[in-house]
């Protein structure tokens, strides 16, 4: 997929990446601060195109710009600073993650950056969190790689001289290449297949004459309900691109315009890979009719996910937010620990680093049936299909329904703030909250809690006392009220 080009002057190595579609990304760079020469670029990654949009010299100049002034950086150990540059005179935007690390025996400041045209600003902003999360984890692994290289080869460096030291430092580039390529592929796929801000209800299941015309009534109810219970994050799989995309558009009706731009339709010709961080994404099964979700990427998603199979009409969901985040952090620590303990580059490959920490044995059956029924979505579906299709009535009714959910979420947040004096006291009674806010159905509570979690992150963990309650323990707690 990638070819290594001869290093351009002034000796900056470059890797060109062959992408299937048009890439909005101009380049990605890895730079460092040299105490004598100032900011220097170590490596450039750029999409392989017929027309060169930025010369290597221009990319080097822009990448150097991200480290200017960092000589006085005084950050905590392990800190990663995210910086966003808009250079109107150059017509580009640069997202740069600045961090400290040990490479070639010296502690210095580094910058991992992506460069896009300024015209892609509106395209990129909804994806900013996804990209930053990806780049942040690349840096975590990169720090370990740099430290291991320095630690394991310090004796060889002393014996073989400084030239050997430079060779050892270069070994981080293949690891970075393997991590940067998926980020470029993600942006390329989003450029061609992202869901538009405005969705015509005529392209969704909600435009059917009657409920059940396109899919089974119970399946549609479970899909929308679980989608809302998992903070609007769903993956839709199937054998027909048309059928998958229709469900994707339907679920995206319940998202904000910005969240829709962070969602992706499936490709008819070939299936995309699952990407953590997207809200809704459609994926095609292979020729055998099977599809495997990568455990690592699913665990790294910021919110729990709903899995919807349109071929067999099944809906599965992950545990609630607080449990998902707890498991995510444990898995991340486990992966980095295994990465640290690896004794060879083959052992450090991404596919072989799988929960080897003895203290963490993840449940591979992370998707479970939708256990909690709701009245909110059921009442909405019963009423919306009584309206005449083909007009704007259903769109207006949907907007009213979403407004009601949002108001309920804000009311729930305010209720908890008043009851706890904005977190100064523990929350007293979940039972009273459910009665006072008319959320006695567990599904209704889960939907409003999920929406409130997006407005005020950490609410789940605060309500249930400790962030590591499992779903079973959580239900036991609810039964005591």
UniProtKB/Swiss-Prot annotation:
Record-level GO BP terms: autophagosome-lysosome fusion; autophagy; axon extension; endocytosis; late endosome to lysosome transport; negative regulation of exocytosis; negative regulation of immune response; negative regulation of protein phosphorylation
InterPro entries: C9orf72
A single cellular component GO annotation: postsynapse
Any one Pfam family match given in the protein's UniProt record, by short name: C9orf72-like
Coiled coil regions in record: none
Keyword Cytoplasm: yes
Ranges where the cDENN C9ORF72-type domain occurs: 200-343
Record keywords: Amyotrophic lateral sclerosis, Autophagy, Cell projection, Cytoplasm, Cytoplasmic vesicle, Endosome, Guanine-nucleotide releasing factor, Lysosome, Membrane, Neurodegeneration, Nucleus, Secreted, Synapse
PROSITE patterns registered for this protein in UniProt: DENN_C9ORF72 (PS51835)
Molecular-function annotations in GO: GTPase activator activity; guanyl-nucleotide exchange factor activity; small GTPase binding
Subcellular location: Cytoplasm; Nucleus; Cytoplasm, P-body; Cytoplasm, Stress granule
Primary localization class, coarse: cytoplasm
Disease in which the protein is involved: Frontotemporal dementia and/or amyotrophic lateral sclerosis 1: An autosomal dominant neurodegenerative disorder characterized by adult onset of frontotemporal dementia and/or amyotrophic lateral sclerosis in an affected individual. There is high intrafamilial variation. Frontotemporal dementia is characterized by frontal and temporal lobe atrophy associated with neuronal loss, gliosis, and dementia. Patients exhibit progressive changes in social, behavioral, and/or language function.
Record protein name field: Guanine nucleotide exchange factor C9orf72
Gene: C9orf72
């Amino acid at each position: 997929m990638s070819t290594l080009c001869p290093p351009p002057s002034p000796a900056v190595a470059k890797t060109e990446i062959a992408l299937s579609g048009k890439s909005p990304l101009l380049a990605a760079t890895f730079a460092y601060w040299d105490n004598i020469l100032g900011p220097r670029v170590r490596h450039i990654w750029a999409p392989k195109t017929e027309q060169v949009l930025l010369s290597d010299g221009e990319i080097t100049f822009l990448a150097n710009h991200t480290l200017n002034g960092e000589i006085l950086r005084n950050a905590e150990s392990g800190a990663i600073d995210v910086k966003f540059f808009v250079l109107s005179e150059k017509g580009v935007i640069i997202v740069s993650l600045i961090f400290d690390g040990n490479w070639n025996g010296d502690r210095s400041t580094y910058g991992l950056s992506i460069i896009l045209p300024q015209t892609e600003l509106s395209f990129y902003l909804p994806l900013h969190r996804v990209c930053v999360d990806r780049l942040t984890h690349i840096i975590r692994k990169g720090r370990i790689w740099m430290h291991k290289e320095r630690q394991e080869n310090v004796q060889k460096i002393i014996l073989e001289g400084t030239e050997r030291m430079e060779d050892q430092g270069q070994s981080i580039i293949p690891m970075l290449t393997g991590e940067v390529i998926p980020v470029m592929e993600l942006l390329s796929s989003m450029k061609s297949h992202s869901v538009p801000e405005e969705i015509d209800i005529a392209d969704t299941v909600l435009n059917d004459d009657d409920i059940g015309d396109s899919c089974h009534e119970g399946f549609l109810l479970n899909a929308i309900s679980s989608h809302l219970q998992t903070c609007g994050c769903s993956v839709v799989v199937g054998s027909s691109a048309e059928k998958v995309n229709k469900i994707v558009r339907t679920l995206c009706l319940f998202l904000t315009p910005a969240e829709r731009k962070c969602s992706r339709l499936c490709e008819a010709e070939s299936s995309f890979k699952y990407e953590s961080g997207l809200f809704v994404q459609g994926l095609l099964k292979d020729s055998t009719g099977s599809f495997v979700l990568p455990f690592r990427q699913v665990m790294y998603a910021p919110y729990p996910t709903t899995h919807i199979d349109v071929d067999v009409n099944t809906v599965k969901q992950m545990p609630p937010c607080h449990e998902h985040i707890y498991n995510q952090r444990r898995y991340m620590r486990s992966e980095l620990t295994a990465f640290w303990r690896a004794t060879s580059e083959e052992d450090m490959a991404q596919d072989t680093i799988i929960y080897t920490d003895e203290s963490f044995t993840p449940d591979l059956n992370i998707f479970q049936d939708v256990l909690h029924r709701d009245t909110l979505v059921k009442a909405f579906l019963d009423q919306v299909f009584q309206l005449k299709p083909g007009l704007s009535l259903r769109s207006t009714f949907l907007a009213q329904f979403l407004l009601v959910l949002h108001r309920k979420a804000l009311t729930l947040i305010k209720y908890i703030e008043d009851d706890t004096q904005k977190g100064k006291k523990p929350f007293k009674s979940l039972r009273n909250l459910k009665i006072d806010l008319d959320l006695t159905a567990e599904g209704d509570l889960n939907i409003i809690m999920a929406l409130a979690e997006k407005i005020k992150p950490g609410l789940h963990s605060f309500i249930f006392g400790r962030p590591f309650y499992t779903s079973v323990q959580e239900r036991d707690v609810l039964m005591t009220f």
